[in-house]
A protein has these predicted regions:
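Compact, glycine-rich, soluble single-domain proteins
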Residues: 2-127
């Protein structure tokens, strides 16, 4: 059962595919838009389903304050090329960068789908 904090209402959802491997990185990737979506992110959630992720654009700094579980961070540039992967960032940590965007996902997601710096991500918008 989903609660008030389980989704960020944006309307834009994508499937993200790794062009190098062909693997689907996430089948339910949601854009965090607007002040509330960008502020709240994954805070206060007890968990997220496998394959779900949240995209922040731009990604100047990410924190895991008030989070209950670690997350994988997949940073990418304006061409959607992966610039950095930070696996299993624990709660109450900060990571600063100047990326065009970042995907926050369950820990192990990047390794399971073999995402590495230099990979090209393809965002396929859901209908």
């Amino acid at each position: 059962m989903q609660g008030w904090g389980d989704r960020v209402s944006t309307g834009k959802r994508s499937i993200v595919r790794n062009e190098r491997t062909g693997h689907i990185v996430g089948e339910d990737i949601e854009d965090a838009t607007g002040l509330w979506g960008s502020f709240k992110g994954l805070m206060f959630r007890k968990s997220i389903p496998d394959g779900y992720g949240l995209v922040f654009r731009p990604a100047r700094g990410i924190h895991t304050n008030f989070m209950r579980f670690p997350i994988d961070l997949i940073y990418f540039d304006k061409a959607n090329r992966v610039t950095k992967v930070r696996p299993a960032m624990k709660p109450w940590r900060w990571d600063f960068t100047n990326a065009a965007g970042v995907i926050e996902m369950n820990p192990g997601s990047a390794a399971r789908t073999d995402v590495q710096p230099g990979d090209l991500l393809r965002f396929e918008e859901e209908a």
